[in-house]
C-alpha cells in the first residue's frame, strides 16, 4: 500500500491502536480463500499481540467448482486440479462463519455484532460510536453504502426485493441479465 506496508499491516495497526485507545480486546479475524490464507498468516505473524485468546486470526471460506461458460459443467484441469476450484465470494462469510464453528465461538464469548469490510477498504474501520448505537437501538444489521460510479462495476448493490419490498444487498451473481444496476 505505502512505505512497504500491506493492507493487512495497516489493518493490524488500526486494530491495535483501537484496543489501546479503548482498553477493549476487539478481535480481528480474516476470511481467506485457499489461495490467500498462507500469505495472510505470514504477514500477520509480525503482530504477535493481534490474536485474541480463543479465536483464530483467520478462517477459510468455502471453495466451489469452476463452471464452464458454455454448458455449466465443472472445469476439468488434470494437470493442476486446484485450478478446478474458486472462492465463492464475500457472501460466503455467513455460511463459513457457521460452518467453521466460529459463529458459535463468537457468540459464546458474548460477541453480538461483527464489523465486516474488504481488506482493501482502509477507510472502513471499527467505530465504537456506531457499535454503541447498534446496541442502544437494537439494530440487527447496518450497512454503509455510497453512490456507485462508473468504476464500481464489481461487487454487490442495494436492491428492493420483489417478494416483500425490503431493501437487500444483492450480489452481482444474483442479477438477471437486463436488470444490471
Residue ranges and their predicted role:
Residues 1-181:
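Domain-scale recognition of functional cores that engage charged ligands
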Amino acid at each position: 500500500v505505502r512505505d512497504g506496508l500491506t493492507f493487512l499491516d495497516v489493518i493490524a495497526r488500526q486494530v491495535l491502536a483501537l484496543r489501546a485507545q479503548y482498553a477493549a480486546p476487539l478481535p480481528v479475524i480474516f476470511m481467506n480463500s485457499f489461495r490467500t490464507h498462507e500469505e495472510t498468516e505470514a504477514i500477520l505473524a509480525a503482530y504477535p499481540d493481534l490474536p485474541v485468546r480463543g479465536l483464530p486470526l483467520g478462517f477459510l471460506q468455502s471453495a466451489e467448482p469452476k463452471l464452464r461458460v458454455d454448458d455449466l459443467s465443472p472445469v476439468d484441469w488434470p494437470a493442476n486440479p486446484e485450478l478446478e476450484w474458486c472462492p465463492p465470494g464475500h457472501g460466503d462469510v455467513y455460511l463459513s462463519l457457521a460452518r467453521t464453528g466460529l459463529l458459535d465461538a463468537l457468540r459464546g464469548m458474548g460477541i453480538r455484532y461483527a464489523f465486516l469490510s474488504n481488506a482493501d477498504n482502509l477507510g472502513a474501520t471499527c467505530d465504537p460510536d456506531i457499535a454503541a448505537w447498534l446496541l442502544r437501538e437494537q439494530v440487527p444489521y447496518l450497512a454503509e453504502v455510497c453512490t456507485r460510479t462508473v468504476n464500481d462495476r464489481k461487487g454487490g448493490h442495494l436492491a428492493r426485493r420483489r417478494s416483500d419490498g425490503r431493501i437487500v444487498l444483492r450480489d452481482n451473481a444474483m442479477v438477471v441479465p437486463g436488470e444490471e444496476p
